Amino acid sequence: MSLQLSMFAPKSEWVPPHELPDLSNCKQIAIDVETRDPNIKTKGPGWPTGDGMIVGYAIATENWAHYIPIKHVGGGNLDELIVNRWLKKVFESPADKIMHNAQYDAGWIRQSGFTLNGKLIDTMVIAALLDENRFSYSLNALSYDYLNKTKSEKELNEAASAFGIDPKAEMWKMPAMFVGPYATDDAKLTLDLWNYFSVQINKQGLSKIAELELNLLPCLIDMTWKG
């Protein structure tokens, strides 16, 4: 299936990174994956069974952030072999790996053949420790409430409307240039949230509980993987 570029689609100046930097000295790396997960609403996430695929990776560090598309049906992808060689180094580095809903992202990364080293941190888990009575723990809601920031969804939604597709469930069909800014924001906001939350954890005396919760994440992923 291939989408024709709609004459009504908004203009986008976004392009994927021209080169992939050396992140070996980074202490924290935020990661978000964009996926094709066709049966998530009926069968749950597809990563334990390989039902779907990652179409792109958003990576954010203190000094660099970008979206790296590899399998968008609409085009604009980077060479997957080159990207995978770089990602292997990133994922296997000792840096803390920060995600929002880490079981999903880390699960898909595992399904894609990578090993994640370093401490796994989930900002969704930490948010629940800090405030167990919230209505929403979505990345956008948390970012708005704690950071006064939100994701840039306008261009994504306008493009999806022009193509006649669902901006979230069918994001994989779109040209990467319309997904790039949105996906990059996912990773950047996740990193910003963790930088804020890490201070609040110490202030509220929750460090030991947070450590316990985060240490459970790899076990939960293993259990889901093995069924």
Task: Place the predicted regions along the sequence by residue.
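Active-site-proximal helix-loop-helix substrate-binding element of RNase H-like nuclease domains
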Residues: 2-12, 52-55, 59-202, 220-221
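Residues at beta-strand starts and edge strands
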Residues: 27-29, 53, 217
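Sparse, context-dependent recognition of short Cys/His-centered cofactor- or disulfide-binding micro-motifs
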Residues: 42-44, 94, 167, 208, ...
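Short consensus segments that form the blades of beta-propeller domains
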Residues: 45-50
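N-terminal accessory regions of nucleic-acid-interacting proteins
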Residues: 1-41, 83
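Extended, well-ordered alpha-helical scaffold/bundle regions in very large, multi-domain proteins
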Residues: 208-227
